[in-house]
Amino acid sequence: MDIKRIILYVIVALLAIALFNAWQRDYPPTPKPTPTVEQPTANGDHPTAYTPPAFTPGAAEKTKKAGTIALTSKVPEARLITVRTDVLDVEIDTQGGNIVSAKLPKYPVSLEEKQTPVQILSGEPNELYVAQSGLTNGNGQPTTVQFESAKKQYVLENGQNQLIVQLTGRAPDGLLVTKTYTFHRDDYAIHLAYQVKNNTSKPWQGSLYTQITRRQPPTEHHHFYVRSYNGASMGSPQTPYEKLSYESLDKQNIDRTSQSGWIAMQQHYFLSAWVPGNPELTYHYYSHVIPASGEPNVYVVGFVSPQMNVAAGSEAATHATLYVGPEIAKRLKGLAPGLERTIDYGWLWPISMLLFWILSSVHAVVKNWGWSIIITTILIKIVFYWFSAKSFRSMARMREMQPRIQALKERHGDDRQALSRATMELYRKEKINPLGGCLPMLIQVPVFIAFYYVIIESVQLRQAPFIFWIHDLSVKDPYYILPIIMGLSMLAQQWLSPTSPDPTQQKMMWILPVIFTVFFINFPAGLVLYWITNNVVQTLQQWYVNKTYESHKAKLKARRARKRKR
């Protein structure tokens, strides 16, 4: 194998390792919490699972100290309302009307547990993750309302496209509050509407707040290639996507205003996000951390709407949208600008989005994500064929120069400067770029990395089958057949390459496929499938270039001769 090809493979491997190291640096593993014994409160009862923390808009430091969150008991069943649609199973706590549980029946936890849906929101103390919303008074303090509903169970029946859950209650200051959740068929976006009727004799001032409260989850023990971002994020017209890691929230609270925007909590494949109801208004975004002794901290991120002024005898309304579901670009893009960036495609996000569009377009025809990966890879190799052919021909010319370069080495002996000048003069005379074999191949490296992110982060490939024994393209091949095929494809590619006279390079020809087979053995099957297809197509392209190399060289020589005659 040509030494430049070896260098290219090593660069790709080093890039992968560098990405891993950067990821580890930015998102270090969370230490395991020390087990603690739950202590009852002073009156002998456990406090409720959570309460909306107090805050003062515009004063992040005050939010650190305001409010507490109870960590030792779950919401009583008597307070829960259940809502079931075709894509969501939700539980609402009538105290505050907050969503304390959200499951996704169309997304099983694993292929082995198909009856167990993925749960995003949970009121369980050890995995607290709830979507809260409510009203504040004129002092910025939240008011807790005990709501009532017409039913305890709501189901989106066949033939229905919309399900409305209406909660009513009276606030401590006498306001009549109606909180309405609207669910739609095949939709993970939940519309929230608040209506306030001021039946008192005094004017009322207040705001809508929405927030996500989450205990920092334990680090998932995956291999580095699936170490996806897990934490908070937000977007605004100025900054469409900004990660807010738990570590950064520990150091500094969010305290800023923005027109429209959104706030979210991310995990691999799924997220929850609050989106303001009116993109023309300016909202205050905030966060604070609630320390938990011996356990991971609890993090709160949210926003507050502009203040409403409701005269006595009048009413007002405000609204927002909660998204709880999979990270699907077309769904997220329609909710808020930049929300689709929560699909964490990394620093090559634009390329990844383009590749996913191509991949999904192919899938719309072939209906199989494995075949879609193969076809998309072939299309990529066709697009980059000119670069590959240029690289192959450049390497072939360099091999032709080896006897002449060897002669220069013998002539100049240990005089390295003279050898370097003579070598560069030879390259100039023969119109050879010594980097011509590497650069065209390096241009393709960003595409490989971008496609890597597409396969790792796209929820559409989660539990997607291919053929035969491959039932999930997002996890490793259970029988390691694909990594072995990949190693064999590398051997075939090297066998086609002219043998180098250098014994060291000859050894590398046989060692490198083994190294890459081991390196890829735990990679997702979809990524290995891409690499196999890439190798096979590249081998065929190299075979064709080698076959036509002499005729290409003759045509090039004739073209240069015609130019000299002119």
UniProtKB/Swiss-Prot annotation:
It is found in: Cell inner membrane. The keyword Transmembrane applies. Pfam families: 60KD_IMP (PF02096), YidC_periplas (PF14849). Keywords: Cell inner membrane, Cell membrane, Chaperone, Membrane, Protein transport, Transmembrane, Transmembrane helix, Transport. InterPro entries: Membr_insert_YidC (IPR019998), Membr_insert_YidC_N (IPR028053), YidC/ALB3/OXA1/COX18 (IPR001708), YidC/Oxa/ALB_C (IPR028055), YidC_ALB_C (IPR047196), YidC_periplasmic_sf (IPR038221). GO terms for biological process: protein insertion into membrane; protein transport. The keyword Iron does not apply. It is a multi-pass membrane protein. Disulfide bonds: none annotated. Interacts with the Sec translocase complex via SecD. Specifically interacts with transmembrane segments of nascent integral membrane proteins during membrane integration. This is Membrane protein insertase YidC.
